[in-house]
């Protein structure tokens, strides 16, 4: 029972995918669930709740460590995207039949911001600099609302697969920026309610994400995209996700040593730099790529990366907690 509660979101994602294959009609375009309208409302709701949940007071406490902040933000919005471009160029050499949507999915994964809650929780478990982790994860999410769509356009134009930016910019403002900052402004007026209902706020966001994933897979099932590719493609994507995670993890560890960060800062820098947010990644993908029937393929890398980062980083956090020299003091 405890395992089910702690992994409810991942199980929900799996259930959404299974339901899409079993019953794609209602969630597809033109279906009875009106997914296009529901997804837009859901995107705005998620960003509103993100703004409502963000404590600027706590963020300010960790704002002073510029070397740590530089590493995290450079990895999130510079190194990761460059690695994504490298993947985009090199993977077709060893996987010639790779679907273009998978290539776009890896690029998209690489420009997403960090997670907030799990970065902070894992840093706390490993006895790292929790205040700095909160600052960097929250700051990258604020930047990500602006930078992720811009980087998607910039990198995909370099790769030859961009979409018109004008209509996208209007949707970004209407469905992400306005709800996000409305939530931030409203937070101080409903702070007690938000603090008392944190679990419900998270459940609402997770439910919307599960619905967006369901509708994305419904479209791809209706278009018979999965029949064209199958299990071999899925396994290959998982392999490249593991390679990407391992490569970035190694680069972050090396950079922390070069910058001579102390133990607590290294832990915070690592967790904030290697993690990518599914919570913001799914709604932003719907916003940027929503008209594409192969959206589920674009989401596949981040859907594999998410459980991988939780599992591996959980092991790291427990190991670092046990090897903390202050543990018995």
Where do the protein language model's features map onto the residues?
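Extracellular/periplasmic helix-loop-helix junctions in multi-pass membrane proteins
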Residues: 28-30, 224-231, 285-303
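Helix-loop junctions at the membrane interface of multi-pass solute transporters
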Residues: 58-62, 117-129, 253-258, 284-290, ...
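The feature identifies polytopic integral membrane transport proteins across all domains of life
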Residues: 66-73, 94-111, 128-138, 235-238, ...
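Membrane-helix cytosolic exit motif
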Residues: 247-256, 299-325
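Membrane-interface helix-loop-helix junctions at boundaries between adjacent transmembrane segments
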Residues: 88-146, 152, 156-165
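Structural signature of multi-pass alpha-helical membrane transport proteins
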Residues: 1-95, 99, 153, 157-263, ...
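Membrane-embedded alpha-helical segments of transport systems
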Residues: 11, 75-83, 110-116, 132-153, ...
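C-terminal hydrophobic structural anchor segments
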Residues: 251-286, 327
